[in-house]
C-alpha cells in the first residue's frame, strides 16, 4: 500500500521570499513603480509570478497596459531564474523530515504554483531534489492549485489513494486544494498568506518540521 506526502514549495519547504522580492523589485523599479518589503512578498508569493506583479500594478495604476503586465512578468521570471537561490533558506527541520520520509518508504511529491522548471531548479540548487519522486508545477497540467486536479493527478500518477496521502502547505490556496480533493491537510504556520492561520482550513497545524 503506497503512502504519500505532497508538499507545496514556497513558504512550506523553503523561505524563498527574499529572492522573490529581489526579482519583484527589479522589475518594479525598472518600470518606475514602488518596491516592496519581504513581508509584503510573503503575502503575495503563493499566487504565482503573474498574480504577484498584477497585485502590485493594481495598487499603483488601475489603468495599466496588459502588455506591460505580461512583459514585466516575463522579466520577473528571467531575473528570478538567474537568482533563484541566492537568499532562499530551507525551513527548519525540512531536510531531516524528508530523510525520515524516504527511510520509511513514503512517496514524496511537490505540488506548486511555480513553473515546473523553476521548482526543479530551486530544489536542485538547495540540494532537496533527490528526495522527491514527482514534481508538478503550475504548467505541468492544464490546471493548477486551487484546482483539486493539480493534487489528484499527482496521486493518480503515483498510484496513491487519497486516504493514504497528506498534503502540506502554508496558504488558503493549498488548503482549498486539499479540502476539495478530500485529502488531509497540514498547515505550516507563518506561511505565504494574508489570512490568519486560524481562518484557514486545516487538519493539523505545525510551526516547522522539527
Predicted segment positions?
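An amphipathic alpha-helix signature
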Residues: 21, 25, 46-54, 73, ...
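Asp-based, Mg2+/Mn2+-dependent phosphohydrolase catalytic module
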Residues: 1-3, 39, 99, 116, ...
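Conserved SAM-binding loop
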Residues: 6, 13, 90, 108-111, ...
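Active-site neighborhood of HAD-like aspartate-dependent phosphohydrolases
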Residues: 1-43
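Alpha-helical substrate-recognition element adjacent to the catalytic core
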Residues: 28-60, 66
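Short, acidic loop-to-helix structural element flanking the phosphoryl-transfer center
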Residues: 81-110, 116, 120, 145-148
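Metal-dependent phosphoesterase signature
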Residues: 31, 56-96
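Phosphate- and divalent-cation-binding pockets in alpha/beta enzyme and binding domains
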Residues: 23, 52, 93, 118-121, ...
